[in-house]
């Protein structure tokens, strides 16, 4: 395995906090606290990613803040991998909900938000979901086959982008706490454009 692929495999978990705000600059200590990891271990992983030009940094006093350079194609690709990693983690923890989401994701972009995305869901928690596209009877039939309470919002991606720009609270919540399913590329590009400002 090459050095760069080892960096990917061992570091996807430490990049998850960056998905709350793609443009955020974070100290290693801040990420370590949020993930309950040793700061030195995390700093070494971030340094390795930085040396591979996968994340960038700025010096702030004696410390470094790490961030994604959203103008680079590699940042888009890495964010897509991190979003896939989040999806896989979710599916491994919530098997029954995962079956529903896998069915709905065929040919669609989905965003899970709310208590499940924040990892605070309890037994009986409802599923908050955005499906980018039009409401269809096929999707409604899929949802009705499952014993979950599902709150679905059908929204064109262009309207979601517009609501992000105008500061609509639900759109901002979705941008910061989400798990993406299905066709992620367009949603990630929309979030990158929003955070680039």
Walk through the language-model features, giving the residues of each.
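Short, hydrophobic beta-strand segments that form beta-sheet elements in well-ordered domains
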Residues: 112-113, 127-133
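Catalytic core of pol beta-like nucleotidyltransferases
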Residues: 1-106, 117-123, 133-197
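Short acidic amphipathic segments
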Residues: 107-111
């Amino acid at each position: 395995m090459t050095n760069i692929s080892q960096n990917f495999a061992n570091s996807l978990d430490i990049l998850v906090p960056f998905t709350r705000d793609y443009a955020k600059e974070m100290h290693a200590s801040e990420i370590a606290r949020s993930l309950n990891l040793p700061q030195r271990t995390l700093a070494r992983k971030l340094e390795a990613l930085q040396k591979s030009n996968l994340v960038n940094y700025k010096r702030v006093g004696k410390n470094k803040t790490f961030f994604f350079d959203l103008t680079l194609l590699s940042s888009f690709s890495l964010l897509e991998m991190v979003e896939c990693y989040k999806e896989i983690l979710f599916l491994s923890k919530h098997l029954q909900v995962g079956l529903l989401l896998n069915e709905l994701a065929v040919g669609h972009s989905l965003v899970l938000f709310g208590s499940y995305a924040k990892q605070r869901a309890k037994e009986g928690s409802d599923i908050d979901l955005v499906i980018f596209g039009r409401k269809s009877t096929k999707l409604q039939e899929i949802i009705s086959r499952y014993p979950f309470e599902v709150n679905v919002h059908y929204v064109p991606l262009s309207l979601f982008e517009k609501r992000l720009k105008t500061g609509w609270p639900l759109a901002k919540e979705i941008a910061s706490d989400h798990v993406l399913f299905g066709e992620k590329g367009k949603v990630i590009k929309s979030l990158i454009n929003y955070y680039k400002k």
